[in-house]
């Protein structure tokens, strides 16, 4: 009998449209001979299954079931493609764990940790992971711009601490710009992190569990048309993404080994993508995406293709890993 797979997409953040694209890619490429997939939209106001004729059927949140044509559907697994809250910050994972449904992304603790830029870097530093100097802000605290500049220098990046797809990110070149940049960050989160500028080559490393083994995918070099890899660069084609990256074999292995080490130390599972900048010859960690985009414009599918892994095989392996951990 085919396993019933709920493809969770949407979410409560600015990234919900990206997530819908990712979820539809999974629905399209998943092997329908092996699985019975359902598109589950998880939005602030309602959770519902979208049928092939676009009819919405509400999800029963008490047990994550849906009633279609008088038949109650119980899902065997959730393929989590939600970027941002609640699918990438641990909330959905915790809910599914409580009701006993396996899901494809990392567990709730790892999800919450990796979604918090400050906390993740604090955990990784003792392992020798290099990262930019940073300064943390709460929304209600007074902003001392001189103290910030003294610590991180200029230019710097002001970011929402818990947001993805470069929403709420501003590159700041003068001290006078810090206040307005912080306000932009606070539209996405009530915490902000300010990081020193790292000059160098930016790369992205996909690390996945594929057929039972942790695997680093070919490294992608990112060259944004603008000043940094923002939303438009990521999803509107305003960047060059070169796979494999134009770095030495030694540097490729170095950054892949670090990405795998992070994945294993954090006890990750499923799909992930970590970003680094080679600054002064050494990879500096930027962030980790535990539900990376898998739309046509996304990096991870490009990397999988270069590794000879089809999306059908990638998604199938991800589901089987989740089912086997039930």
Swiss-Prot record:
<feature type="binding site">
    <location>
        <position position="287"/>
    </location>
    <ligand>
        <name>Mg(2+) 2</name>
    </ligand>
</feature>
<keyword id="KW-0067">ATP-binding</keyword>
<dbReference type="Pfam" id="PF07478">
    <property type="entry name" value="Dala_Dala_lig_C"/>
</dbReference>
<keyword id="KW-0436">Ligase</keyword>
<dbReference type="GO" id="GO:0009252">
    <property type="term" value="P:peptidoglycan biosynthetic process"/>
</dbReference>
<feature type="domain" description="ATP-grasp">
    <location>
        <begin position="121"/>
        <end position="320"/>
    </location>
</feature>
<feature type="binding site">
    <location>
        <begin position="149"/>
        <end position="204"/>
    </location>
    <ligand>
        <name>ATP</name>
    </ligand>
</feature>
<dbReference type="GO" id="GO:0008716">
    <property type="term" value="F:D-alanine-D-alanine ligase activity"/>
</dbReference>
<dbReference type="GO" id="GO:0046872">
    <property type="term" value="F:metal ion binding"/>
</dbReference>
<keyword id="KW-0464">Manganese</keyword>
<dbReference type="InterPro" id="IPR013815">
    <property type="entry name" value="ATP_grasp_subdomain_1"/>
</dbReference>
<dbReference type="GO" id="GO:0071555">
    <property type="term" value="P:cell wall organization"/>
</dbReference>
<dbReference type="InterPro" id="IPR005905">
    <property type="entry name" value="D_ala_D_ala"/>
</dbReference>
<feature type="binding site">
    <location>
        <position position="287"/>
    </location>
    <ligand>
        <name>Mg(2+) 1</name>
    </ligand>
</feature>
<protein>
    <recommendedName>
        <fullName>D-alanine--D-alanine ligase</fullName>
        <ecNumber>6.3.2.4</ecNumber>
    </recommendedName>
</protein>
<keyword id="KW-0547">Nucleotide-binding</keyword>
<dbReference type="InterPro" id="IPR011127">
    <property type="entry name" value="Dala_Dala_lig_N"/>
</dbReference>
<feature type="binding site">
    <location>
        <position position="275"/>
    </location>
    <ligand>
        <name>Mg(2+) 1</name>
    </ligand>
</feature>
<keyword id="KW-0133">Cell shape</keyword>
<dbReference type="GO" id="GO:0005737">
    <property type="term" value="C:cytoplasm"/>
</dbReference>
<dbReference type="InterPro" id="IPR011761">
    <property type="entry name" value="ATP-grasp"/>
</dbReference>
<keyword id="KW-0573">Peptidoglycan synthesis</keyword>
<comment type="pathway">
    <text>Cell wall biogenesis; peptidoglycan biosynthesis.</text>
</comment>
<dbReference type="GO" id="GO:0008360">
    <property type="term" value="P:regulation of cell shape"/>
</dbReference>
<keyword id="KW-0460">Magnesium</keyword>
<keyword id="KW-0961">Cell wall biogenesis/degradation</keyword>
<dbReference type="InterPro" id="IPR016185">
    <property type="entry name" value="PreATP-grasp_dom_sf"/>
</dbReference>
<dbReference type="InterPro" id="IPR000291">
    <property type="entry name" value="D-Ala_lig_Van_CS"/>
</dbReference>
<keyword id="KW-0963">Cytoplasm</keyword>
<dbReference type="Pfam" id="PF01820">
    <property type="entry name" value="Dala_Dala_lig_N"/>
</dbReference>
<comment type="function">
    <text>Cell wall formation.</text>
</comment>
<keyword id="KW-0479">Metal-binding</keyword>
<feature type="binding site">
    <location>
        <position position="289"/>
    </location>
    <ligand>
        <name>Mg(2+) 2</name>
    </ligand>
</feature>
<dbReference type="InterPro" id="IPR011095">
    <property type="entry name" value="Dala_Dala_lig_C"/>
</dbReference>
<dbReference type="GO" id="GO:0005524">
    <property type="term" value="F:ATP binding"/>
</dbReference>
<comment type="similarity">
    <text>Belongs to the D-alanine--D-alanine ligase family.</text>
</comment>
